Amino acid sequence: MNTVRETIAAIATAQGRGGVGIVRLSGPLAGKAGQLITGRTLTPRHAHYGPFRDDDGLVLDEGIALFFPGPNSFTGEDVLELQGHGGPVVLDMLLQRCVQVGCRLARPGEFSERAFLNDKLDLAQAEAIADLIEASSSQAARNALRSLQGEFSKRVHSLTEALIALRIYVEAAIDFPEEEIDFLADGHVLSMLDAVRGELSTVQREAGQGALLRDGMTVVIAGRPNAGKSSLLNQLAGREAAIVTDIAGTTRDILREHIHIDGMPLHVVDTAGLRDTDDHVEKIGVERALKAIGEADRVLLVVDSTAPEASDPFALWPEFLDQRPDPAKVTLIRNKADLSGEHVGLEQCDDGHVTITLSAKGDDTGLQLLRDHLKACMGYEQTAESGFSARRRHLDALRQASEHLEHGRAQLTLAGAGELLAEDLRQAQHALGEITGAFSSDDLLGRIFSSFCIGK
């Protein structure tokens, strides 16, 4: 049997007790199930209050029944919602009644999956439903809602249309060689290609911010021993998460804390002090610290502002740049301002580098500057009209599309190879199609929708 034609049922409200609980059905039997359970023919899109009965006519509960005939429903199929009281026993009895009249229990995310398969929404919009439910901040919720409304998808479709137009031009020139179009001399191809690359770069940047808001930013605290890294972690965490002593090298391993700043998720990693050492255990800690630096979204390079090397803290940077090629993702923290007498504040250079001077021992002003800086790095300052949610798989697809465009441009400019450019354009279009589901394997769809709540 084609499972899409089966009628599915699930409890759509969260587990536990509440004033209202909802059982949702989708499929060809939804209308008949509503008639059998309520004892009446349901008028589409009208609220019907009355009893919900079992097969013997006994009342299971009282509530509201809503019937939405397809295709004008969330899933594109006939949909029935039974809104009763929110007790788990009552809802389970009602769900079993739905099974009794011919429904089967829905898989996690199957309602959203059917909406996708029936072209009611694309894959990015379907994922935004889960992101909206799981949002840990108002900004993340707004971004998810904009993705659900199609903002991210519109940007991807715009890129796809531009690629299609470019492919038509290139492939027409290849198929009709008598036109003798010189791609390089024409200049039109390069102009169109560079325009797509520029827009793709913008979407990549905005999607990266959206992914940080959704998944949280990994912040690694690094620096020399005894620079105050663990004290800074404790202040950010709001508790004594790390042992703090005056003995250099107290922290010898990775210490992770998951915190929220105004609802924004951050994964803060305290690391062993970076120095040459003969201590085998400490050496392992330093190696792990360098590995964590390479995987970080943001590195806080902490220096002791009273130490001699504080006058030239960037002497530490070669060690960091081996792991973190982008120095723009490193924030310099000049710690112990209470001892050095330096002014607490934030300084941003013309090249974008940020230095924050603070004291990790109770300096509220400096710590608030750091919190605000981290929020800005995550895109918290974006307005509700500019952001959208994104996932790591979206970033991978955008990266692949960008790489294909870069490769195709190189093939065109270095070898004048229009055929190779055409293939790279096709591959880039395919990568973008994976975001919206235009090109997606059944395995990918299964993994995505299985992570949803049952009833969604």
From Swiss-Prot:
Does the keyword section mention Cytoplasm? Answer: yes
Instruction: Give the enzyme's EC designation.
Output: 3.6.-.-
Name the cofactor(s) required for activity, per the record: K(+)
Q: SUPFAM superfamilies per the record?
A: P-loop containing nucleoside triphosphate hydrolases, TrmE connector domain
- Positions with a binding annotation for (6S)-5-formyl-5,6,7,8-tetrahydrofolate: R24, E81, K120, K456
NCBIfam families reported for this sequence? mnmE_trmE_thdF (TIGR00450), PRK05291.1-3 (NF003661), small_GTP (TIGR00231)
Q: What is this protein called?
A: tRNA modification GTPase MnmE
> Which species is listed as the source?
Pseudomonas putida (strain GB-1)
Q: Which gene encodes it?
A: mnmE
